[in-house]
Structures are given as structure tokens and as C-alpha cells.
């Protein structure tokens, strides 16, 4: 699963996801992509699950680019622990995704296979998405 090799700080604030994506809204690598339509935190496990679904559907032909990276640590406290006594330990990593952000790109496969693969990948994610192409949006 994806996670940073090292970070400046061990823990981070929860924060909010405001507005739409400023960059990474266009396809840069592949012919087809998966664009986010809602703001959400996507976990490293969800990214990996979507990646596996996409690659399996493509029968390992073509190429997949993951355009988001989980760089935000999420900390949790153990079950049945009283309030207070500090923030919990970092448990997993998430990527903040804004609407309009391209999350996955694929190339080297036919359009029908690409659409099916991205549809299966989108089913693994907790947000509404849209399949985009170089020619236009679909």
C-alpha cells in the first residue's frame, strides 16, 4: 500500500476539503481517466483496491497511473479508551481528493476494456466519479 517514506510531522489535523481541484484536472499520461466529482478522503487501502480491480480487468495489458498519493496520517484511539490523554497513534494514510481531480489514468487498451476497468475501479471508491477521455468527457 502507498504511504510516505518519511514526514515532517507524525500526526496531522483533520482539516476540511474546500472548493474544487486547482491542478491535476486534465489527463496528462493516459487516454482514459477517472475524475472525482465529490470531496472526500480516500484511504491507501481504497486506492490499492481500485488499482487491483483496474489492472485485473485490463488483464495486465496497458499501463495504469495513480495520480493521488495518501500523504495525510489519520490517528485513532483504541476501543473503550477514556477521553483525554492525548491524540491516538497514526493508524492509516489518506489522500484528500477535491472535486475535479484526476485519480487514475490508463492507456494501451481498447476503449471498451478501459471503460469497464475504470467502472470497476470506481466501485471500490467511496465517491461519485466520471470517466474522462482525451477526446472529450463521457
From Swiss-Prot:
**Gene Ontology MF term list:** rRNA binding; structural constituent of ribosome; tRNA binding
Answer yes or no on keyword Repeat. no
User: What keywords tag this UniProt record?
Assistant: Ribonucleoprotein, Ribosomal protein, RNA-binding, rRNA-binding, tRNA-binding
- Per the record, the domain of life is Bacteria
Respond yes or no to whether keyword Ribosomal protein is given for this record. Answer: yes
Q: Which Pfam families match?
A: Ribosomal_L16
Instruction: State the GO CC annotations.
Output: cytosolic large ribosomal subunit
| Coiled-coil intervals | none
Gene Ontology biological process terms, A to Z: translation
Family stated for the protein in its record: Belongs to the universal ribosomal protein uL16 family.
The record's listing under PANTHER family reads: 50S/60S RIBOSOMAL PROTEIN L16 (PTHR12220), LARGE RIBOSOMAL SUBUNIT PROTEIN UL16M (PTHR12220:SF13)
Spell out the subunit comment.
Answer: Part of the 50S ribosomal subunit.
| Its biological purpose | Binds 23S rRNA and is also seen to make contacts with the A and possibly P site tRNAs.
Q: What is this protein called?
A: Large ribosomal subunit protein uL16
Lineage of the native species? Bacteria, Pseudomonadati, Pseudomonadota, Alphaproteobacteria, Acetobacterales
Amino acid at each position: 500500500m502507498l504511504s510516505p517514506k518519511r514526514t515532517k510531522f507524525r500526526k496531522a489535523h483533520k482539516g476540511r476539503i474546500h472548493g474544487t481541484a486547482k491542478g491535476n484536472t486534465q489527463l496528462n499520461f493516459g487516454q482514459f481517466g477517472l475524475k472525482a466529482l465529490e470531496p472526500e478522503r480516500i484511504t491507501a487501502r481504497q486506492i490499492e483496491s481500485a488499482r487491483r480491480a483496474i489492472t485485473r480487468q485490463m488483464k495486465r495489458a496497458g499501463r495504469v497511473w495513480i495520480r493521488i498519493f495518501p500523504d495525510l496520517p489519520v490517528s485513532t484511539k483504541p476501543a473503550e479508551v477514556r477521553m483525554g490523554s492525548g491524540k491516538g497513534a497514526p493508524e492509516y494514510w489518506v489522500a484528500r481528493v477535491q472535486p475535479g481531480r484526476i485519480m487514475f489514468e490508463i492507456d494501451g487498451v481498447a476503449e471498451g476494456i478501459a471503460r469497464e476497468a475504470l467502472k470497476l475501479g470506481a466501485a471500490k471508491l467511496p465517491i461519485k466519479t466520471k470517466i474522462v477521455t482525451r477526446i472529450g468527457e463521457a
